[in-house]
C-alpha cells in the first residue's frame, strides 16, 4: 500500500485517502491498518465483472440493470472492454436521471458500517442512559 501510495502521490501530487481492498476482502485488522495510514476503505455495490472480458454490451447491461441511487460501481483499469462500455453506460445512466459524482460525495465519514452489499450506513449509536 505504501509503495502504491508513493507512486500515486508522485504522479498526481495528491496522496490517496481512499483504498479498495483487493477482491473486497477485509476484516477489522485490515480496516485498522488502513485507517492508521490516514485512509478510508471503500466498497462497491455493483460489480461490472469487466475482468471476465465480457463484451461492452454485456458490461453495459449488467451495470445499468443493477445501479441504484448512491451506487458505487467497480471497474478495473486493465479490463479489455471497459473503455468501450463506459460511454454507453454513462449515457444510459444520465438519461435515467443519474448524476455521476466523485466517490467523496458518496462515502460517509466514520463511524459507519458496511453491509454485505457494500453499502455504507451510519453506525448506530448506543444510548448509555
Indicate residue ranges for each PLM-predicted region:
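Short, solvent-exposed mixed-charge patches
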Residues: 127-129
Amino acid at each position: 500500500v505504501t509503495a502504491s501510495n508513493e507512486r500515486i502521490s508522485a504522479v498526481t501530487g495528491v496522496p490517496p485517502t481512499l483504498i479498495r481492498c483487493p477482491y473486497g476482502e477485509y476484516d477489522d485488522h485490515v480496516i485498522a491498518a488502513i485507517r492508521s495510514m490516514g485512509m478510508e476503505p471503500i466498497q462497491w455495490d455493483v460489480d461490472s465483472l469487466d475482468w471476465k472480458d465480457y463484451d461492452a454490451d454485456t458490461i453495459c447491461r449488467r451495470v445499468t440493470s443493477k445501479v441504484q441511487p448512491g451506487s458505487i460501481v467497480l471497474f478495473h483499469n486493465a479490463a479489455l472492454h471497459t473503455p468501450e462500455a463506459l460511454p454507453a453506460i454513462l449515457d444510459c445512466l444520465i438519461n435515467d436521471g443519474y448524476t455521476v459524482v466523485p466517490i467523496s460525495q458518496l462515502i460517509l465519514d466514520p463511524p459507519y458500517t458496511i453491509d454485505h452489499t457494500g453499502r455504507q450506513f451510519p453506525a448506530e449509536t448506543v444510548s448509555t442512559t
